[in-house]
Amino acid sequence: MLSKRIIPCLDVRNGRLTKGVKFEGNVDIGDPVETARRYYEQGADEIVFYDITASHEDRGIFLDVVERVASEIFIPFSVGGGINTVEDMRAVLVAGAEKVSVNSGAVKNPDIISQGAAAFGSQAIVVGMDVKQVQKSEAIPSGYEIVIHGGRKFMGMDAIEWAKTCEALGAGELCVNSIDADGTKDGYELTLTRMIADAVSIPVIASGGAGSPAHMYDAITRGGATAALIASIVHYGQYTIPDLKRQISGMGAKLRMVW
């Protein structure tokens, strides 16, 4: 059995690390470069960096910040935000990322997934999915709808069907973020995560809602996720990554332990 991963997420706005709740009220909490280095030194398995307003503002990602983060860490590094073309992907990979995460750009142009996979390999292509629970309908039979542009635009697309499409187009991984749970620290949306994990054969990262080691354990067991994305739980000093790994491992999950 492969070890499950613990992945800190850096939401970056104007070059600064921020955090909000349900995609609102983001506050400045520090320097993303220093924070990434600290998480790397603590034993994070991977770092995810999102330029959270790049798509909404219709601009490119802050490549200088990506380069600075990449120079400080020596673990897999995934970068997303404002990636709309294969050239955008190339620029992020050249800046030092191992993976690119496409979200709004893939919803608007699904071919970017297959184009990116052909150019760089499926292992480099992550599709980020921002999802909100809605009333079930013919268009949204699962009751989970895809939302883009930082939670601003509902797309009338069913999240489970979109996950299957992404896998078919060549995505190597899915990062499934529940807008309803984001930043609440009340636990992951396990029903959503499990439905998607059961619908695809590629790795699924659970995102949104981590508030305790038990929440993370639930995501990688009951939720079927291969990794747990975390933010508030470590950004505000509630836990360190070694704390989390020790407690989750003690519950019976297989993790890569801190050296």
Curated annotation (Swiss-Prot):
Q: Which reaction does it catalyse?
A: 5-[(5-phospho-1-deoxy-D-ribulos-1-ylimino)methylamino]-1-(5-phospho-beta-D-ribosyl)imidazole-4-carboxamide + L-glutamine = D-erythro-1-(imidazol-4-yl)glycerol 3-phosphate + 5-amino-1-(5-phospho-beta-D-ribosyl)imidazole-4-carboxamide + L-glutamate + H(+)
Q: What class of enzyme is it?
A: lyase
This protein's superkingdom?
Bacteria
Give an example GO cellular component term for this record.
cytoplasm
Instruction: Please verify whether the record's keywords include Amino-acid biosynthesis.
Output: yes
What does this protein do, in the record's words? IGPS catalyzes the conversion of PRFAR and glutamine to IGP, AICAR and glutamate. The HisF subunit catalyzes the cyclization activity that produces IGP and AICAR from PRFAR using the ammonia provided by the HisH subunit.
Regarding protein family, the annotation reads: Belongs to the HisA/HisF family.
| Protein name as annotated | Imidazole glycerol phosphate synthase subunit HisF
Organism, by scientific name, is: Nitratidesulfovibrio vulgaris (strain DSM 19637 / Miyazaki F)
* Taxonomic lineage from the root: Bacteria, Pseudomonadati, Thermodesulfobacteriota, Desulfovibrionia, Desulfovibrionales
Q: Which gene encodes it?
A: hisF
